[in-house]
Swiss-Prot record:
GO terms for molecular function: structural constituent of ribosome; tRNA binding. The keyword Ribonucleoprotein applies. It comes from Ruthia magnifica subsp. Calyptogena magnifica. It holds the Pfam family Ribosomal_S10. This is Small ribosomal subunit protein uS10. Belongs to the universal ribosomal protein uS10 family. GO terms for biological process: translation.
Length: 103
């Protein structure tokens, strides 16, 4: 696997959780002898919702909500077999979505 790279993309709603998970991945990869590029913070996606609080009248009474999605990107350069095994066994937090691609 010396000529392949692993691209890891993390998504979460909590920035503290995603940064902690990214740090765990970087430490695991470096401990097994691979080099890591990142974590690179990608732009935060903000979804805004406006909801009427009154069921019938009072158009001016509204609540506004925002949902932020944080994304981090990492490249593991020249991973070894130990690196792949360690990354597969790694237990990350429940609120983090992990997507892995081989380049």
């Amino acid at each position: 696997m010396s000529n392949q790279n692993i691209r890891i993309k993390l998504k979460a709603f909590d920035h503290r959780l995603i940064d902690k998970s990214a740090l765990e991945i970087v430490e695991t990869a470096k401990r097994t002898g691979a080099s890591v590029r990142g974590p690179i913070p990608l732009p935060t996606k903000k979804e805004r919702f406006t909801v009427l609080t009154s069921p019938h009248v009072n158009k001016k009474a509204r609540d506004q909500y925002e949902l932020r999605t944080y994304v981090r990107l990492m490249d593991v350069i020249s991973p070894t077999d130990k690196t792949v095994d360690a990354l597969m066994k790694l237990d990350l937090a429940a609120g983090v979505d992990v997507a892995i691609k081989l380049n």
